[in-house]
A protein has these predicted regions:
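Short, cationic low-complexity segments
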Residues: 25-59, 121-129
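Acidic/polar-rich alpha-helix caps and helix-coil junctions
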Residues: 1-25, 61-303
Length: 303
């Protein structure tokens, strides 16, 4: 835990003879399918989408391209074997949070080494070329925070609510009650931290140290006045920040539902993503998909 945690699921390893029974099991299937790294390897699920990665591209001012990010696809190694020569994009400016969230070829996968690309991907055809990175412990933490040196059985608590999320909720509220500058203040607190925080580095001490940046990182706060902007524009700015900051933390789908934009957003997403992910052809999201089915066991108990 740290000062940002508001509510988290507490886990542990190697306590009271429990082994990994109390460990963080929720993400054991989402560790990379990495046969050359048996201490790291998992099933390779929870892959970030092309659309999410594209969303981290920024303009010349380091601001998100909310309405146009999908017009330019960030360079990726889809359909390229790890044995084939390939270099990551070092020119397109991206928000530095990208490489703390997404594992991609040519960028340090925390301290596990450079991500090799397709060799660590379960099936690029089904889900693309990326691995999740947000819920991966460091290799140098294995002895302390993992069971039997197995990274996926670890003592990393799962944050259900953290302070950044509270700030962004507050920004949403300020937009709705007509205080746009206060909303900007809250959003800029998040963006300033991203600007002042550490960037993923190359070199012997990767991803930390003083080596060269692993990409052309650029991020800045909003400096224009939010007063006078329409609520539609303000909502887009706050919501986009929530997507970037809270990516892969399990909130975005439910945010889309509560904002009442799930059908519009997800159907546009399908149109973009199916260029690479063929099983999405013909997929349609409608209002009946917004809510989970009630389990039969719960229905039976309600009589």
């Amino acid at each position: 835990n740290n000062a940002e945690v508001v509510w988290s699921n507490q886990v542990a390893v190697n306590v009271a003879g429990a082994g990994y029974d109390r460990s963080q099991r929720g993400f054991d299937l989402s560790y990379p399918n990495a046969p050359d790294q048996p201490n790291l390897s998992g099933a390779g699920f929870q892959q970030p989408t092309f659309d999410l990665v594209n969303a981290y591209q920024v303009d010349e001012n380091g601001l998100p391209m909310i309405d146009t990010y999908a017009d330019h696809e960030f360079k990726n190694d889809q359909d390229i074997e790890s044995s084939e020569a390939w270099e990551p994009d070092m020119e397109t400016p991206v928000d530095p949070r990208l490489d703390w969230v997404v594992g991609r070829r040519g960028v340090p996968y925390h301290d596990w080494g450079l991500h090799p690309g397709k060799a660590w991907i379960r099936d690029q055809v089904s889900a693309g070329p990326y691995n999740q990175k947000k819920w991966i412990i460091l290799e140098n933490q294995l002895a302390t925070y993992a069971y039997d040196n197995t990274a996926k059985f670890n003592a990393m608590n799962f944050n259900i609510i953290r302070y950044a999320q509270v700030l962004l909720w507050a920004a949403e509220c300020e937009v709705e009650v007509g205080n746009p500058e206060k909303a900007k203040e809250y959003v800029n607190m998040i963006r300033q931290r991203a600007k002042d925080g550490s960037y993923v580095r190359l070199g012997d001490e990767a991803p930390f140290g003083n080596g060269p940046a692993a990409a052309n990182y650029k991020v800045d706060i909003y400096k224009d006045s939010w007063a006078g902007l329409s609520k539609d524009v303000l909502r887009k700015r706050v919501r986009f920040e929530e997507r970037l900051e809270l990516a892969l933390e399990g909130h975005f789908f439910f945010d889309l539902v509560r904002w009442d934009i799930a059908e519009d957003f997800l159907n546009k997403y399908v149109e973009r993503e199916k260029r690479h992910i063929q099983y999405l052809n013909g997929a349609v999201f409608d209002k009946n998909h917004r809510y989970y089915a009630i389990p039969l066991t719960e229905i039976d108990r309600s009589y």
